[in-house]
Amino acid sequence: MPLLLTGKKFHNDLNKNKCLAMFAPLEGGYETRLLRRMRAKGFKTYITSARGLGDPEVFLLKLHGIRPPHLGHQSIGRNGALGEVQQVIPQASELFNENDKDKLLWLLEGQVLSQSELESLIKICTSDNKLKIVVEMGGSRKLEWKSLNDYILNEF
C-alpha cells in the first residue's frame, strides 16, 4: 500500500515559502506525520502552542522577563510597585543549539494570532535562512496549506 502522505509537496512548499498556514482535519494525526517526515529529511523540529505568545520575536528568540502571578498581599518594599521580574530563556532556544540543521517551528492554535503577530513570524523566517515556520490556522475537511503571506492577504 503506498504512503498517502509522503511529505514531498509539503517539503517543497515549505522550502519555497518558509512560512506556511496549515489547515488540518480536527481529528488530528496529520501534523505528527508531517513532523516525522520533516525529521527524516534532516529538520530539527519544535512544536508549541501560539496561545500566550505575546511578541513572537522576543518570546521565541530573545531573553525576556515575565512577571509571576499575583498571589495576594505582598510587601512592595522589596520589589517595587510592579513586582519581581524573572528572566526567562527563549522558548525556542533548543532549536538554535545546532547551526547546521534546518529548523522547523510548528505553532498550534495559530488562529488566535493577530495580523501583526503573523507578519512578525514572516519577518523571523526571512531573517533566519534555516528557520521554517508552520502555523495551524484552524480546521478543514482535508489537509491543506498555503503561504502565510497569501493567508494574510486573503483573510485580513
UniProtKB/Swiss-Prot annotation:
Keywords linked to the UniProt accession:
Membrane, NAD, NADP, Plastoquinone, Quinone, Thylakoid, Translocase, Transport
Family annotation (Pfam families): NdhN (PF11909)
Q: Give the record's membrane topology.
A: Peripheral membrane protein
Does NADP show up as a keyword for this record? Answer: yes
Q: Which reaction does it catalyse?
A: a plastoquinone + NADH + (n+1) H(+)(in) = a plastoquinol + NAD(+) + n H(+)(out); a plastoquinone + NADPH + (n+1) H(+)(in) = a plastoquinol + NADP(+) + n H(+)(out)
EC class: translocase
Coiled coil location: none
Task: Identify one Gene Ontology CC term for this UniProt entry.
Answer: plasma membrane-derived thylakoid membrane
**Which EC number(s) does UniProt give?**
7.1.1.-
The cellular location(s) given in this protein's UniProt record come to:
Cellular thylakoid membrane
Q: Name one GO molecular function term.
A: quinone binding
- Asked if the keyword Cytoplasm belongs to this entry, the reply reads no
Q: What does this protein do?
A: NDH-1 shuttles electrons from an unknown electron donor, via FMN and iron-sulfur (Fe-S) centers, to quinones in the respiratory and/or the photosynthetic chain. The immediate electron acceptor for the enzyme in this species is believed to be plastoquinone. Couples the redox reaction to proton translocation, and thus conserves the redox energy in a proton gradient. Cyanobacterial NDH-1 also plays a role in inorganic carbon-concentration.
Give the multimer and partner information. Answer: NDH-1 can be composed of about 15 different subunits; different subcomplexes with different compositions have been identified which probably have different functions.
Q: Give the protein family.
A: Belongs to the complex I NdhN subunit family.
From the Swiss-Prot or TrEMBL record, give the protein name.
NAD(P)H-quinone oxidoreductase subunit N
